[in-house]
């Protein structure tokens, strides 16, 4: 017996299928990929930069469709031209590679939907020298920085809590700014590590717990709201951005007359190096602190901490 097709069902399925490959759907679904919220924000910003630089217009479904419909040679030429522009701006290899990764991710997603006929696999990323500078500041210098914070003020309580997390737990900038109030639970903090989606718990020292509790005592807010917020008039109450966190660390370092230019990442380097000094080079424990995926990264820290290369060069120099 031949089944009679239901035109209503066919029409509905066809409508759904067409909507799934619509211009705006590609962009919407791309932002729902199983990547961390931080990566989503980073990719969205990177793609916007790509379209603004190459077309003068912010990212939108129409621009995405035009790009995805380009012949392969033209699409690759556009992306290579964009990479050249980024190099001319003297951006770091990591920054350039992140922006290229965002474009490649969008193209790969569109290819899965059969909405793109080219690949960007031949667009090479820039070679990055891993952890060229792992130097930081000594613990006594960092102590001067945080002791100068006026913890009697609302801003001071926030800044002190942030600075304790950066040092005591060697957190990355993105790990701090992504925190919500509900992520702080008694003696633990739930964070999203770099490249991960699921949160994991880390233990907090007593000083860190106290600093967070004192900040929350004046911050208030619902559990789902950002743990650290902007306090200036223009952005009050919004999640503290990574850029603002960088300015905060830099300002505190300048106030304390620290000679080195400080950043959240340099604080992280300082913390990891200080623990390696304290533990006589226990790279396995340092890995638990830092959340580095590869143990080899901590070996680089330890070798440079001990100036292994300098010692080797001195021994060779003594031979001739």
Model-predicted regions and their roles:
Residues 1-320:
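Conserved catalytic core of the tyrosine transesterase superfamily
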């Amino acid at each position: 017996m031949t089944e009679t097709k239901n035109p209503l069902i066919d029409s509905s399925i066809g409508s759904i299928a067409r909507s799934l490959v619509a211009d705006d759907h590609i962009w919407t679904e791309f932002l729902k990929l199983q990547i961390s919220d931080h990566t989503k924000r980073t990719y969205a910003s990177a793609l916007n930069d790509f379209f603004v630089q190459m077309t003068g217009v912010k990212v939108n479904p129409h621009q995405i469709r035009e790009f995805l419909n380009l012949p392969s040679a033209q699409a690759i030429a556009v992306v290579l031209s964009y990479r050249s522009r980024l190099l001319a701006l003297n951006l770091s290899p990591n920054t350039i590679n992140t922006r290229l990764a965002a474009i490649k991710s969008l193209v790969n997603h569109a290819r899965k939907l059969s909405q793109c006929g080219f690949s960007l696999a031949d667009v090479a990323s820039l070679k990055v020298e891993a952890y060229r500078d792992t130097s930081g500041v000594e613990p006594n210098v960092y102590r001067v920085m945080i002791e100068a914070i006026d913890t009697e003020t609302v801003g001071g309580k926030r800044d002190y809590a942030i600075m304790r997390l950066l040092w005591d737990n060697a957190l990355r900038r993105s790990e701090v700014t992504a925190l919500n109030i509900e992520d702080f639970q008694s003696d633990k903090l739930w964070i999203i590590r770099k490249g991960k989606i699921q949160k994991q718990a880390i233990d907090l020292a007593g000083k860190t717990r106290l600093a967070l509790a004192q900040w929350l005592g004046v911050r208030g807010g619902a559990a789902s709201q950002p743990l650290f917020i902007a306090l200036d008039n223009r952005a009050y109450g919004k999640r503290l951005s990574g850029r603002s966190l960088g300015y905060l660390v830099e300002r505190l370092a300048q106030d304390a007359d620290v000679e080195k230019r400080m950043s959240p990442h340099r604080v992280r380097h300082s913390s990891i190096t200080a623990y390696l000094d304290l533990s006589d080079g226990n790279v396995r424990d340092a890995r638990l602190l830092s959340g580095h995926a590869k143990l080899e990264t901590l070996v680089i820290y330890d070798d440079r901490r001990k100036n292994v290369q300098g010692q080797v060069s001195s021994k060779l120099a003594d031979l001739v």
